[in-house]
Amino acid sequence: MASYPCHQHASAFDQAARSRGHSNRRTALRPRRQQEATEVRLEQKMPTLLRVYIDGPHGMGKTTTTQLLVALGSRDDIVYVPEPMTYWQVLGASETIANIYTTQHRLDQGEISAGDAAVVMTSAQITMGMPYAVTDAVLAPHVGGEAGSSHAPPPALTLIFDRHPIAALLCYPAARYLMGSMTPQAVLAFVALIPPTLPGTNIVLGALPEDRHIDRLAKRQRPGERLDLAMLAAIRRVYGLLANTVRYLQGGGSWWEDWGQLSGTAVPPQGAEPQSNAGPRPHIGDTLFTLFRAPELLAPNGDLYNVFAWALDVLAKRLRPMHVFILDYDQSPAGCRDALLQLTSGMVQTHVTTPGSIPTICDLARTFAREMGEAN
């Protein structure tokens, strides 16, 4: 692609850089490599941690399933990190969820402009994303390399998170873009803020027939929520695209090589259930990248402005390392719990980085739950 020379010439640049001073650096690098090897051996003796992020569209039964799973373990070896409802409703702002739904309703009724709605939605999503992003940053220093999943002993600690940072920093902004209440520029601004993906990031997405999903959502009571079927369709579509995007990237897909295969229109808010890693690599048109071939992001020659291309590079870098699992929610709560438990046997653990990491992580998770877990 003519507008992205950095991709075309990266290998030549790297080759030239390596050729300068190579012999001088060889000796200097040897002690560093020995130190790194020692650090790896020490890390492999550390306890292991399993992190599971239960994510997907709202109203499927994620929280119920997670709480049932957590109840199977002891208080010391499995810890639940809930949605930060108190932060959303009290600490970070007042009634953020109600504000989001009211703003979308007013836009749909023609009471406010798309621009006015976008200002409110962007501010609200900052509030929604902050607890996830900062918690990820505090946790990161304690997460070491991946320990693998085959024949691994039980982890010293299992953390079950109610959502990953990408929910608030990617999926819900993208759905609001499909709903007309957020700009594509704002969505990519959130993408740029997604924290680097830690090793052993296991994300569980959900599958549930749409009619069953609507029925479950209609029966639950969450502060400030409205039954918005258009938004439900949009967020279901986005999570389907997310699963496809991870498969596309892990299968060797390159957005900048395949960009020309995209049409000039964003996908409609409808689509199939998320799929597991089985099957052929998805077409780029069935991934999140298709959302960003939008006129607002294109230069006069029809190519993406480089700043937006860089944001898509960030998106690819964040999603590629994720371990994605699909949970069938079309069963009883106990059945969902058992299916989730079975999925965990194939998930990837990590070593922690210090002898004190496990109690520190436990304290972090329980502090989060105590301070932000339930609205007062």
UniProtKB/Swiss-Prot annotation:
On assembly, the entry states:
Homodimer.
Tell me how this protein is used: Used in molecular biology as a selectable marker to identify transfected eukaryotic cells. Used in cancer suicide gene therapy to selectively kill transformed cells.
What other facts are recorded?
Phosphorylates and thereby activates certain drugs like acyclovir (ACV), valacyclovir, and famciclovir to a toxic form, that leads to successful suppression of the infection, while the uninfected cell does not have this ability because it lacks TK. Mutations in thymidine kinase may induce HSV resistance to antiviral therapies in immunocompromised patients. The most frequently observed resistant strains are unable to express TK and are avirulent in animal models of disease.
- Where do the catalytic residues lie? 83
Q: Which UniProt keywords apply?
A: ATP-binding, DNA synthesis, Early protein, Kinase, Nucleotide-binding, Transferase
Q: Which organism is it from?
A: Human herpesvirus 1 (strain CL101)
Per the record, the coiled-coil ranges are: none
Region listing for Disordered, in residue ranges:
1-39
Query: Is Chloroplast tagged as a keyword?
Result: no
Q: Where is the composition biased (Basic residues)?
A: 19-32
Described purpose of this protein according to its UniProt entry: Catalyzes the transfer of the gamma-phospho group of ATP to thymidine to generate dTMP in the salvage pathway of pyrimidine synthesis. The dTMP serves as a substrate for DNA polymerase during viral DNA replication. Allows the virus to be reactivated and to grow in non-proliferative cells lacking a high concentration of phosphorylated nucleic acid precursors.
Lineage start = Viruses, Duplodnaviria, Heunggongvirae, Peploviricota, Herviviricetes
Q: Where does substrate bind?
A: 101, 125, 222
Q: Which family does it belong to?
A: Belongs to the herpesviridae thymidine kinase family.
Q: What is a GO molecular function of this protein?
A: ATP binding
Q: Does the keyword Transmembrane apply?
A: no
Which GO biological process entries does UniProt record here? DNA biosynthetic process; TMP biosynthetic process
Binding annotation for ATP: 56-63, 216
Q: What is its EC number?
A: 2.7.1.21
Per its record, the protein catalyses: thymidine + ATP = dTMP + ADP + H(+)
Name of protein: Thymidine kinase
